[in-house]
Amino acid sequence: FTSYHNVCYFSGFLYCQFGRRYGAVLSKDGVTTISAAIDGGQPWRRSTGDNVTYTDWRRDSYFTALKDLLKGVKRLGIEFDHVNLDLKVLLEDHFPNVELVDCAAAAMDLRTIKSAEEHVLIRKGAEMCRVGGRAVMEAVKAGVPEHEVAIASTNAMVRAIADSFPFVELMDSWTWFQSG
């Protein structure tokens, strides 16, 4: 998998691309994330499975890691709705005798079946949104700039997330708000 949602769903690790490739290989034995060596070990700490970290000192190190994980593979499921043409060409170049098949719809079907734990997490996420929305309502006043309203909401949500999930590493939390 290469998409944010599938890498996260199947491994527990949500990557932030920063111009480097990320992925997750799901096999009958488990899941292994492939990550750039810029994350301070976060993929290994956050993943439910194994992790292979590659350096980008060589242009194709990502594909070297993939080849190590996929030795002998004849068919490879990729997400046609996420893999761009450049990546597809590179996969075809690096795996010349491998059939690339679309696994996006099947993966989406799997993600639609929610466990009790996922229901709890979804409700908790909705609660964080409610906290942010309430902060927006309290901050909106005549003359208050939009960025101040967004800051109030983001800060409220970050505090609520930190209180509710003290074991997570917060990243990319913000509020999109527009008045008018």
Question: Which residues does each PLM region occupy?
Answer:
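Generic secondary-structure signature for well-ordered alpha-helical cores
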Residues: 71, 96, 124-134, 138-145, ...
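A composition/biophysics-driven feature that prefers long, compositionally simple stretches
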Residues: 1-132
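Short catalytic-site patches enriched in acidic/histidine residues
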Residues: 7-17, 104-107, 113, 146-180
